[in-house]
A protein has these predicted regions:
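A generic fold-level signal
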Residues: 22, 34-36, 55, 79, ...
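Histidine-centered catalytic micro-motifs
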Residues: 50-56, 91
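Short, conserved beta-strand element in jelly-roll/cupin
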Residues: 43-45, 54-70
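Structural motif
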Residues: 60, 67-69, 76, 92, ...
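Short acidic-glycine-tyrosine-enriched beta hairpin
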Residues: 74-89
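A short glycine-rich, His/Asp/Glu-containing loop-to-beta-strand
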Residues: 16-51, 104-109
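Ligand-binding loop in jelly-roll beta-barrel domains
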Residues: 89-110
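Catalytic-core "active-site belt" of small-molecule-metabolizing enzymes
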Residues: 2-20
Length: 110
């Protein structure tokens, strides 16, 4: 990871541990541990994400690889590479299928 006095962060997924999460396996590319960061970003290998919601965080999913469906308040939506999904606070969401997704949360996860 490269970090400088201006709080610029450059990080490759090989520099962070692969972790199990409710959505599959994730790589925390940007998260709470980074000073002065107002959001988080994870590369997630989704393999059946359990439904959940966030009280104050908005999430953005950008599908990088694979195909599947996201569940948004009980409604299924098909997604494929190039699809962006905006998930406002309070929306119960999850995913089915095998896909790699860039997930960004604003503000940091609650």
């Amino acid at each position: 990871m490269a970090k400088n006095p201006n709080n610029l962060i450059i990080r490759h997924q090989d520099e962070v541990a692969k972790e199990r999460s409710a959505c599959g396996h994730r790589y925390r590319l940007l998260s709470q541990g980074d000073n002065d960061v107002a959001a988080w970003a994870h590369a997630v290998d989704i393999d059946g994400a359990k439904t959940h919601y966030h009280k104050i965080s908005t999430e953005l999913y950008y599908v990088l690889e694979g195909e599947g469906k996201v569940l948004l308040d009980g409604e299924e939506q098909e997604v494929r590479p190039g699809t962006m999904v905006h998930i406002p606070p309070g929306v119960v969401h999850g995913a089915v299928g095998k896909m790699r997704v860039l997930v960004v949360g604003i503000p940091d996860i609650d």
